[in-house]
């Protein structure tokens, strides 16, 4: 068995806990959701009066194999129901104060205190989630692995190499000019090195798994490509949404959960076929659940939500 890796999936906007893992025969659920309720005939039962959303059949397959842990009622004290503050808490693991560093960024620095792994973490999407932010923690943000890299628009190899060398020289010469320039220059060099490493992973990837044509599936395929390449990446991060279903609640959530369930299943299948699944777990979370009572055809911000941990090394079941 090799180094352990984690793929973090953020369901942005507040995934509706009660329509994801459904207490379908609970009278409080039935009475409070006359309009935004999944009826018993559509639910995929998992026992104890609970069932998965009807579009989560692929997650149910993994659940039946003992690969899925369902973690109920996940939240934090004195919930404020704000998207922004809730995400801050999830990203920093600081429920009582505003934190500056992310829990995954801190984990990177603990694993690599010398900052010598420039591809320790990869975020799929624009920007950088606060969860991955920590002083000195190297993180690459990728929107498309097929086009990722520097100077890819320069077709002539010699010209491209000359341009890259110019950047390396520029950053290298600034080191030793003071702490600020040292930090900026080292960050630049790390970015160049990381882009060179990550830019080559698609050439090494071969798989028969056919991912769906949506942004989440694309990110999960990218995570599989990165992790199967064994370049040293320990953390992959992606997000999907928005699950903020104040209106059109059932249709919106089911469309997004279809993407998520398919992407997770295909990623697991891909890693399994490559004999890499033993070393990887997936952690799926959302900032909060939705209120028990519907608001007509949607739901408003709630508190406790549901999280999932998925993988070969997971002791599946309900927690």
Predicted segments with their positions:
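Metal-dependent active-site segment of extracytoplasmic phospho-/sulfohydrolases and closely related
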Residues: 264, 271-296, 301
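Feature for exported/extracytoplasmic and membrane-associated proteins, marking the mature portion
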Residues: 1-274, 309-310, 314-319
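C-terminal, helix-dominated tail/subdomain
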Residues: 297-311
């Amino acid at each position: 068995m090799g180094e352990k890796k984690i793929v973090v999936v953020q369901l942005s906007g507040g995934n509706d806990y009660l329509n994801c893992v459904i207490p379908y025969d609970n009278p409080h659920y039935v009475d409070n959701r006359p309009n935004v309720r999944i009826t018993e005939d559509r639910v995929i039962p998992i026992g104890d009066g609970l069932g998965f959303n009807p579009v989560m059949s692929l997650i149910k397959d993994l659940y039946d194999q003992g690969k899925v842990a369902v973690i109920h009622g996940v939240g934090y004290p004195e919930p404020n129901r704000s998207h922004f503050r809730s995400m801050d808490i999830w990203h920093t693991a600081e429920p009582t104060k505003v934190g500056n560093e992310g829990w995954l960024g801190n984990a990177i620095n603990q694993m690599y205190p010398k900052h010598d792994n420039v591809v320790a973490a990869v975020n799929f999407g624009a920007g950088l989630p606060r969860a991955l932010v920590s002083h000195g923690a190297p993180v690459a943000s990728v929107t498309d692995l097929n086009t990722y890299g520097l100077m890819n628009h320069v077709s002539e190899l010699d010209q491209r190499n000359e341009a890259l060398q110019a950047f390396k020289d520029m950053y290298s010469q600034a080191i030793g000019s003071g702490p600020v320039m040292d930090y900026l220059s080292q960050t630049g060099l790390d970015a160049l090195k990381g882009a060179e490493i990550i830019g080559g992973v698609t050439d090494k990837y071969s798989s028969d798994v056919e991912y769906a044509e949506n942004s989440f599936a694309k990110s999960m395929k990218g995570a599989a490509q990165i992790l199967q390449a064994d370049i040293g990446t320990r953390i992959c991060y992606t997000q999907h949404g928005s699950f903020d279903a104040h209106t059109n609640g059932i249709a919106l959530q089911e469309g997004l959960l279809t993407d998520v369930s398919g992407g997770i299943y295909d990623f697991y299948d891909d890693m399994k076929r490559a004999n890499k699944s033993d070393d990887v777990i997936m952690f799926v979370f959302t900032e909060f659940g939705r209120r028990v009572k519907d608001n007509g055809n949607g739901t408003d911000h709630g508190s406790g939500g549901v999280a999932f941990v998925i993988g070969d090394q997971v002791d599946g079941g309900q927690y």
